[in-house]
């Protein structure tokens, strides 16, 4: 499938991952210069429900995302995938939109104003529902190495959130916390 719209930097791949797992589909999903691509394997009746379930789940769980089109590119014999995974982004000539920055969501605001929370008073708190997108993007596909966050390694707690499908920071590229500034990766300064 080829999916276009506001589908990068909005928690779209994690949302698609959850839909695929809920429907017991296998395959993969990736960002690329045109939007998002996915290969799905599973029962034909379930595959027929995929687009409807994806649109519903995106509407309910990914408030910054917008699907413009879902196109079945081709059907092929099953490859025998045993899981559904988010794979590395693929390069190409850009034909997709960069999502605008979004105001802090309620869940992040609660963290910022809760004493004892590791993000208490941390102004750069964000998740897949809020935070910087356009202002940090250097190139697409939208992945951390293509953003101004590239020179900042995630701490182990941020990495755990990023890798956890149940977390709202699952694959949130600008994920950060106050520890971030302590583990800056040395990189030559680039003028903007």
Tell what function each PLM region has:
Residues 183-192:
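Single conserved hydrophobic/aromatic residue that forms the stacking wall/gate
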Residues 1-178, 182:
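Intrinsically disordered, low-complexity, mixed-charge
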């Amino acid at each position: 499938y080829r999916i276009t719209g506001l589908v990068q930097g909005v928690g779209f791949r994690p949302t698609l991952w959850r839909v695929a797992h809920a429907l017991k589909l296998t395959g993969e999903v990736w960002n690329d210069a045109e939007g998002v691509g996915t290969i799905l394997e599973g029962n034909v009746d379930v595959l027929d429900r995929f687009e409807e379930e994806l649109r519903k789940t995106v509407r309910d769980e990914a408030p910054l995302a917008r699907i413009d089109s879902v196109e079945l590119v081709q059907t092929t014999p099953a490859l025998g995938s045993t899981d559904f995974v988010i794979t590395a982004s693929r390069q190409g000539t850009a034909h997709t939109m960069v999502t605008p920055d979004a105001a802090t969501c309620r869940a992040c605001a609660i963290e910022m104003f809760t004493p004892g929370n590791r993000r208490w008073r941390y102004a750069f708190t964000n998740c897949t529902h809020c935070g910087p997108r356009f202002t940090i993007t250097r190139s697409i596909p939208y992945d951390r190495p293509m953003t101004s966050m590239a020179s900042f390694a995630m701490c182990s707690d941020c990495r755990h959130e990023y890798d956890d499908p149940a977390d709202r920071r699952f694959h949130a590229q600008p994920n950060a916390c106050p520890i971030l500034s302590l583990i800056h990766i040395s990189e030559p300064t680039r003028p903007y």
